[in-house]
Amino acid sequence: MPHVICEPCIGVKDQSCVEVCPVECIYDGGDQFYIHPEECIDCGACVPACPVNAIYPEEDVPEQWKSYIEKNRKLAGLE
């Protein structure tokens, strides 16, 4: 399962996650970064790099941020 960037990223966009991603699947989505779900290899390198704890494995996204799964897919052009 891919990782998902959620609400805490909005307005922060620290780029630490971008720098550690080995497959460069994290992109600028305007107000936040997003992870392309078809490019993510599920390595998890981005999770500890995020200073605002905005990144989760898709299956572990907190209930209040479940909409970010679809938002990441839309930003990636998959919906």
Swiss-Prot record:
PROSITE patterns: 4FE4S_FER_1, 4FE4S_FER_2. Gene3D superfamilies: 3.30.70.20. It comes from the Bacteria. [3Fe-4S] cluster binds at C9, C17, C50. Keywords: 3Fe-4S, 4Fe-4S, Electron transport, Iron, Iron-sulfur, Metal-binding, Repeat, Transport. The keyword Metal-binding applies. Residues 2-30, 31-60 form the 4Fe-4S ferredoxin-type domain. InterPro entries: 4Fe4S_Fe-S-bd, 4Fe4S_Fe_S_CS, 7Fe_ferredoxin, RnfB_subfamily. One of its GO terms (molecular function) is 3 iron, 4 sulfur cluster binding. Binds 1 [4Fe-4S] cluster. [4Fe-4S] cluster binds at C21, C40, C43, C46. Its cofactor is [4Fe-4S] cluster; [3Fe-4S] cluster. Ferredoxins are iron-sulfur proteins that transfer electrons in a wide variety of metabolic reactions. This is Ferredoxin.
